[in-house]
Amino acid sequence: RPNVTLQMEVEDLRNASPATVSRAGVIFISSNDLGWRPMAQGYLKKRRKAEAEVLQSFFDKYVDLALALLRELTPRMAISEMGLVSSLLSMLTALTAEHREQLAARELSEPAETAHLERLFLFALAWSVGGTLETADRARFDKFLRSASSILPEAGTTIGSSPSDTIYSFVVSATSGEWEHWGKRVPSWRPPQGDLGAAF
């Protein structure tokens, strides 16, 4: 008589009946044992080959060092390393989609395009891995990035910037692929003139 075995992979057991749970086998693999690299590898397999090779070099160069530094700092909230790298991947997906036209204009073998992709990676790294840091720790994270990379904007030399600015004061322009100060994008707020009471 033939036997049938069903194997189902579910995210959780919220909607499972007691009969299902009693027959379920649960395998737990700690993220500490697994690490972030398999998740990054899965992400890179979905990218264009040339782009994946360039991004792989950035993952190798920055991520382990950034996570090691984060252990010495005091983030505002505790997020697992897998969660931080997941945020990094999500930001990279969004940023490369926004910059797709600019990135596709030239081959990734060109230094200008590799530098553009590295700027996007550093921006995503700062706002994912270093995104929950306070001002003092952000300055340390910025110092680490500047010691590891030579393509960060020089504070005080970009339009709208001051010498105390960090990477958090800049964004990568979708048109030029260069660093742009947030102050250039966001106009200074001025209170409306006239009687504010009339608005109510």
Locate predicted features.
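C-terminal, well-structured subdomains that either form a transmembrane helix-short loop-helix hairpin
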Residues: T5, E11, A198-F200
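Flexible glycine-/small-residue-rich
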Residues: E11, F28-S31, W182-S188
